[in-house]
Amino acid sequence: MLSGTSGFSGFTSAFVIGTTSCSDSFLDEKMYSSYGPEVSDVNAKLVGLHRQYAAIWGMSSQQGFVGCWQVGTDVGAPGDTQGVEVPFYRYQELNAENAGVSFLWEKLYELINSANQIIASQAEGGDAAATAEAMFFRAYAYNMLVTLWGDVPLVTESTSIPRTDYTRNAVAEVDGVIDSDLVYAMSNLPVVGAAKNESRINQDMARQLAGEAYLRMGMRDASYFKKAEDAVTPIITGGKYELISARYGKYAAEPGDYYHDMFRWGNQRRSQGNMEAIWTFEMEYNRDVNGGTIDNPQQRRNWVPAFHKLDGMVNADSIGGRGNGRLRISNFVKYGLYEKGDIRNSNYNIRRVMWYNKLGFSKEVGIDAKGFLVDKDKGVRNVTLKTGDQVIPHEGDSLNVFYPHPTKWGAYDETDDFGYAVVKDWPVMRLGETYLLRAEARFRQGNTQGAADDINVLRDRAFKDYRAVAPGAGKVTADQIDIDFILDERARELISEENRRMTLVRTNTLAERIKLNGDMEPAAPSNKVITGFDANIHTLLPIPLTEIQLNKDGDLKQNPGY
């Protein structure tokens, strides 16, 4: 077992956390929850699984990690990149030493090991609901692993000593565990509203995960498409959820729209009026809640442009707080995806227009022939910009400072103007995606009318206001339904929420959808466009090199091409 090569090996070392006292550096890693024998309360262990989940998607040491799952696809383009995400669109640079690849692999196997320990502790006469919650997280982790890596080691028991003899198990074998875990979870988890906390795992969260997992499994065994439909239908028909189609919550009297209301801080939970929410991950602010805030989540700083670099702009909730502009939506999303009247493309949801908000701002500037901002006397005319005027960007601002962007992660905390961390809740699962999962399952079974019906439910919400002047706007018919239309609709509905890379890999469409991205030279710099993609290599990620090196007694083969 090599030590010191990467500092931490989640796969090999996760099985010995809390059981060994050697001084390998990975054991010095900060742990959010203890899974050793000194923890007797199973509920504390289950809460620990949630904190481990948060540690994955709330990581700040590699700020660009959020972008790894969006750039290099049809919907994402790089902004002011941090670095870890660059090989995910400059594919020729993607290798087995990428920090994002290693981090996700390690953290998923840590989550699996912790879940295995809970499952084992409840094996004889234990708490079925506790076992089910642990199985949910194990299924979540394995579903992500097989989607992104293909064949992976299957470990269903925790180990008290390090092992270096792992091999890769076939996807179908891992899928068997995912399936059985989710079947158990769907039967034994509490119903919505009955869990210890509204953010804890319930039956419908398991159903939603099962729907996604079964759709992936259906690509190799079509019988799973029916299982996907059957898994998610009770969420739709159970009467516990409804699509948000009217203003609600603490911002209802402010300018906005009902779709935007779902994603505003203090409006996201079911208890706050969001009856569309299935799983809203509660991101408690550690200023207000002891033990809150896992690391410093970077979603806002990725998705929100760096407006603070513009004269006349100050950080505020109305503009989403302080962003870094590391991640942009692609030209495909900006200019080719939405139809007229779609509320999901309103300025409250995809912000394209802004106004100078700094009190007392006034500045004389030049405007060039293209309408961009230049220095005074350097353009075709001069104008004086003032507070309340529409923002006019420089031509180069579109890569970092000012560009159309989704607002779902925006929020501003006046006690932290710098805004290093996301402090609002995370939208993980909601009813809008449930309809899309069922539409996909129905399409795969040849039921294009059923798929159109599901998508039209979403479009009835999206075009509700516009239909007052354009009746029938947004309606789709069965003959319009194919996998590309469904993927387009997922982008319209779930931009910045879904892991787009996972969606495209599980539908076997990554190679084709990349071609839609639309960001290309010379309009975009050569270091901001997708290059080097080879579907035979880059559809799957490389297994981290450190894992192969540590596994000296096994045959942990690398994916082809890496």
State where each predicted segment sits.
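Long, intrinsically disordered, low-complexity segments
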Residues: 21-26, 75, 108-109, 177, ...
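Short coil/turn linking the two alpha-helices of tandem helical-hairpin repeats
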Residues: 146-153, 216-222, 446
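Flexible, polar/acidic helix-loop-strand segments at domain edges
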Residues: 318-430
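Membrane-proximal, proline-rich intrinsically disordered regions
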Residues: 22-64, 549-562
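Conserved, well-structured interaction surfaces
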Residues: 43-52, 57, 78-149, 165-176, ...
